[in-house]
Curated annotation (Swiss-Prot):
GO terms for molecular function: RNA binding; structural constituent of ribosome. It comes from Dictyostelium discoideum. Belongs to the bacterial ribosomal protein bL21 family. It holds the Pfam family Ribosomal_L21p. Keywords: Mitochondrion, Ribonucleoprotein, Ribosomal protein, Transit peptide. This is Large ribosomal subunit protein bL21m. NCBIfam families: L21 (TIGR00061).
Length: 172
């Protein structure tokens, strides 16, 4: 029995070429959509300290803060849910681990923390999270276990992003 292998080989190679061309065009489209606009300036903390022109206080500024091992992007007026923090409801807290601050025009990136920006926040609620049901089973062994979990959470309202004085230490 003789088969015509050459035509199948040509079909598969042409489909591979077509697929490669599609992947290349998809990469080009992806690059166009994910490129950083030229109007946005990314600034490190060192160059910011030399310029001292950046004041992102207001509704249009955002910050990335570090709270109990996780990072959150916050804007003034946001309510975020974090893991339980041992603080009473209604208390004012200051988040001083600010990793990034930015507006539409400029961004400051800390290495790793920006020392002279702080985020003021208020504890809104201490509550339990949504119930998660965990079901384990082993097929054909009549083994079924159902357990559940409900974690504790803290809801925090962001008051504002404040530019503070630079912290300098003096030694005597």
């Amino acid at each position: 029995m003789i088969r015509n292998i050459g035509s199948n080989l040509m079909k598969s190679s042409s489909s591979i070429l077509l697929r490669n061309q599609q992947q290349q065009t998809n990469k080009l489209l992806f690059r166009n959509f994910t490129s950083i606009p030229e109007a946005v300036a990314v600034t490190s903390e060192e160059s910011y300290n030399s310029k001292n022109q950046f004041t992102p206080i207001g509704k249009d500024s955002f910050a990335v803060v570090h709270i109990s091992g996780k990072q959150y992007k916050v804007i003034e007026g946001d309510i975020i849910m974090t893991d339980k923090i041992q603080v009473d409801v209604g208390e004012h807290i200051v988040l001083d681990k600010v990793l990034l601050v930015g507006t539409k025009n400029e961004t400051i990136i800390g290495k790793p923390i920006i020392s002279n920006f702080k985020v003021h926040a208020y504890i809104e609620e201490q509550a339990k999270t949504e119930h998660v049901t965990i079901f384990k089973h082993k097929p054909r062994k009549n083994y079924k276990r159902t357990t559940g979990f409900q974690g504790l959470a803290t809801y925090i309202r962001i008051g504002g992003i404040i530019k503070g004085q630079e912290t300098t230490t003096t030694t005597n």
